[in-house]
Amino acid sequence: IDCIARTNWRITEKLGASSAHIRGTNICFSETFGGFGWNLTPQEMKNKTDEQFVQGVNMLVPHAFFYSIDGMRKTESPPSLFFQNGYWKYFNLYANYVRRLSYVGRAGKPLTDVAVCYPLKTSWARFMPLDRYDLKKLDEQILEIHSALISARLDYDFLDDVAFSSCSANGG
């Protein structure tokens, strides 16, 4: 997953985590903070990290640690989280926090009681390059469901039609 924008409550992390669960892997990683800009603060780093881990990310790859920020590198994909950053001397505190979250996030096995159909083939069928109203409406509905479930603290997985075809219901 790439988290290279400051948007909140996007479904990308949940899609990645759901995919990892479906495929039986215990790692869902996100490259994060590239393009956030030089005004990225430790508090924003923690908030974005928490938001991603709540949605199932369990390994974070911070972007980036530039050896040099000479020339275009300073503005290519800021910030550098390395020694050029004023918060560098505190980075170990953040890294230890992420390390602990990652350990806990991978130590267990996900138990989700809710599945949300992710209509991938429907999206493909409705795609019209010049008229994206149907897809925009579908995106808004999925984001609304996602936000409601996360706000209610209900864990869930997105399942596409292929994943649904191999599911079974147990105990009700």
Regions found by a protein language model. Name each.
Residues I1-G172:
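Carbohydrate-binding surfaces of carbohydrate-active enzymes
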